[in-house]
A protein has these predicted regions:
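Nucleic-acid substrate recognition interfaces
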Residues: 1-290
Length: 290
């Protein structure tokens, strides 16, 4: 977002690292070449357009992140065509080691971004703490300390990189699943409850299950796909996908499911994904009957 004739927007809440405001289109917003016309601004604003705008512009949101990068998000109204039928359905078991294990034998590795950037982030955060202390010892406001503000941006840059990588991963994976399947069955995970487990909380936050499910749901709604959520307490991991026997004693450390009734040996998560698909289709049949 660039224009030499006027300054950048000023936001009321400076403490929030991500700041934004929304303005509705009253025939005052339009895009021409690499410029956008915004309400109350006399001049056009130069932008980097990431994709072609389709439909009728309803509103725009101007936002600024912690790195002082400005963005314009454009809300448009358009008719979206449903995707052609694939005659393929899939069950998805979400996990920590593997982000997703699917009933077609596909495994998607977790990015483990927090672990990848952990050392670098801790190092830069320690520097930030030291510069905070130096500023306070010198009776300086943090907003007036150039060294503190410079280091603060370094930390923000790492967080921004993690956030962008995670967002890109979830977007591409959810789009691929929606494009290739008519019915997607997934567990209705109690993520808030799972976060209470302090040993797993960090890993669960890192994998972005909630955002993945959110994207699956809105894309399914757009493109005529069906999302079926299997109840939270359905024993997908403990149930044998071959004979239906429930193994009550299954522990988290057992990665291979061994059925004591029929002798089936199968990857634990793959077994769960088959059960999730089966249960989801059962729920769908019951919905149609009722």
């Amino acid at each position: 977002l660039k224009n030499k004739d006027f300054g950048f927007p000023k936001y009321k809440c400076k403490s929030n690292p991500v700041q934004s405001y929304t303005t509705n289109n009253q025939n005052t917003i339009y895009i021409k070449d690499s410029y956008i016309k915004l309400p109350k601004l006399k001049s056009l604003v130069k932008i980097k357009l990431h994709k072609k705008i389709k439909g009728i512009i309803k509103s725009v949101t101007i936002s600024k992140n912690s790195l002082d990068h400005y963005f314009v998000s454009i809300l448009c109204e358009e008719e979206i065509e449903e995707l052609p039928k694939t005659n393929k359905n899939i069950g998805i078991d979400l996990g920590i080691k593997e982000f997703a294990t699917m009933s077609d034998c596909t495994k998607v590795e977790n990015l483990k971004l927090s672990k990848e950037y952990e050392k670098k982030l801790k190092r830069e955060q320690r520097k930030l703490s030291r510069r905070c202390k130096l500023a306070k010892d010198s009776d300086k406001k943090l907003s007036d300390s150039k060294n503190y503000q410079k280091q603060k941006k370094k930390v923000a840059k790492i967080h921004n990189k993690i956030r962008n990588k995670r967002k890109d991963f979830v977007n591409k994976l959810s789009t691929k699943i929606i494009n290739n399947h008519d019915i997607i069955c997934i567990e209705d995970l109690n993520i808030k409850g799972m976060l209470k487990n302090h040993k797993l909380a960090k890993s669960i936050s890192d994998v972005s299950w909630s955002e993945f499910v959110r994207q699956l749901e809105y894309k399914a709604n757009w493109y005529g796909r069906k999302i079926i959520k299997v109840p939270t307490f359905y024993p997908s991991s403990k149930t044998c996908s071959s004979c239906g026997n429930i193994k009550e004693t299954l522990t988290l450390s057992e990665r291979i499911y061994h059925c004591e009734c029929c002798g089936l040996e199968i990857d634990r998560d793959y077994n769960a994904s088959i059960n999730i698909l089966r249960k989801g289709l059962e729920i769908l049949r019951e919905e149609k009957v009722s």
